[in-house]
């Protein structure tokens, strides 16, 4: 079974979403990882928050964007390094992801972005004081288990971190 490039697949999938927020997909050669950054605009000046960045991805304390980072790489498990940075580990060895697993990750990435956008709106309206962004580990696990239970989870396609 041949492996395809995860970078190319993510780029095509994300571009096909016609997503309303600016995003950038990059390949980090040092860590051999793929990084997807999505920038959600903040409608007011937030309290000092290390996640707030300007359009050039530099830390900013003025009108800015909330920068969420999704990293695909050689990790042993999914983790959140700090608020707004999500590490998504491969479900197979050697930095390989199955197509079905990537679909589950994309679903929950979109969910996380919708949650972030909603929390920003609540923050702007004064209904919230802080952002609470976490990766839905349990939901991802349950989604995979549910798909396996109804035979909607096959390991047909394989995606590698390598850029071809």
Question: Where are the language model's segments positioned?
Answer:
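Acidic, low-complexity intrinsically disordered segments
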Residues: 72-135
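Glycine-rich, aromatic-bearing surface loops/beta-hairpins
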Residues: 121-164
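N-terminal interaction modules that seed assembly of large macromolecular complexes
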Residues: 9-63
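Hydrophobic, Leu/Ile/Phe/Ala-enriched alpha-helical segments that form helix-helix packing faces
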Residues: 6-18, 109, 113-116, 120
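Extended, low-complexity, acidic/proline- and Ser/Thr-rich intrinsically disordered regions
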Residues: 4, 59-63, 131
